[in-house]
Amino acid sequence: MAHVVVLGAGLGGSIMAYELQQQLRSEDRITVVTRDPTYHFVPSNPWVAVGWRTRSHISADLTPTMQRLGIAFRTVPATRLVPAENRVELADGSALDYDYLVVATGPELAFDEIEGFGPEGHTQSICHVDHAEAAHAAFERFCENPGPIVVGAAQGASCFGPAYEFAFILDAALRRRKIRDRVPMTFVTSEPYIGHLGLDGVGDTKGLLESALRSRHIKWITSARISRVEAGMMHVEEVAEGGATKPHALPFGYAMMLPAFRGVKAVSGIDGLSNPRGFTLVDPHQRNPAFPNIFAVGVCVAIPPMGVTPVPVGVPKTGFMIESMVTATAHNIGALVRGKEPDEVATWNAVCLADFGDRGIAFIAQPQIPPRNVNWSAEGRWVHFAKIAFEKYFLRKVKLGTAEPLYEWAAMKMLGIDKLKAARKG
């Protein structure tokens, strides 16, 4: 009998538990360790921040689902991983031994790397539903006395899509309130160009996003490095290819900036397991090279940047890409418990819907990291409605405890979008 422990119950961790339950033997055990028993659909946080959703709209209690599936569910944070002893230490003083471990912790948010940055400083965040609720309260106060808005992503950030989404959603929300004419907006990003997205673009994301910003009268600064944030003022350096800098002092009445990520403390600083930023190192099978009974999925996985840029830019880990990591990991652990070697490799394909409040952009990147077999993007009102439908669908899937319904698998196969590279062999 094997015991598999999953650290985290977000997008990667919850679906990981469901897929393991399908791939393991009946005698094997699964334990999920998480700080929060409630799953929050993070892609809807921009809507929460303008009052178009509430916490209850985007949440699912995982406890009854895990119980029904026979998955042990520990709602206590992990404090330290001891891989040499196959043990996870928990905040309540207890510990869990494991045969196999899946790190699905998500990231730690590095607000502290910039003075005055983040919810405890002078900028808002939409990384967590708690942040989104605080951002909404601040937005309501802002609307009583409108002024300039600054939105974007800081140096080292890897998740740029939600920053663009939130800029456009704010634009739509302000127009609905008929105060958009009183709000100058600036988009500030560490990307070397608009639409880079940490991926050197997907299809014509550069043209599509530049056009969307222009048509909404949103100015932008690229290759931006934030030096500090004060109350009502953001200090930014625009960095040229040769290293020359141009300073900007941007006044704001409301600011939302996405931070850089790093690995959580419980799995950081472990030789052979994590890189200097605390992200977990994996091979093509999602397996850690130093500790072969440890796997990792999601934002916590170490992926090198696309290349050298004037300001550091990370690579995003998008939803479908994470699901492909999960599927490969579940199959590979299933093989190991049966005495076989892992042979499945995730495709890391990306299928993304970016909502603009009334329109949106969709893109498919196969694989997410270039060079690609498919490199497509499109814009239209249909994307806004597709994002709403996907929110409802995914939350239902989480509540039911289903990793991939048959009709989802069939639809993706029809579109030629696979989670496993092995699925295309032969």
PLM ranges: what are they?
Residues 2-72, 155-199, 414:
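Beta1-alpha1 glycine-rich phosphate/pyrophosphate-binding loop at the start
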Residues 68-165, 169-178, 245, 256:
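FAD-binding core/adjacent interface of flavoenzyme oxidoreductases
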Residues 110, 118-145, 251-254, 258-324:
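FAD-site-proximal beta/loop scaffold in flavoenzymes
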Residues 363-426:
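C-terminal auxiliary extensions adjacent to catalytic cores
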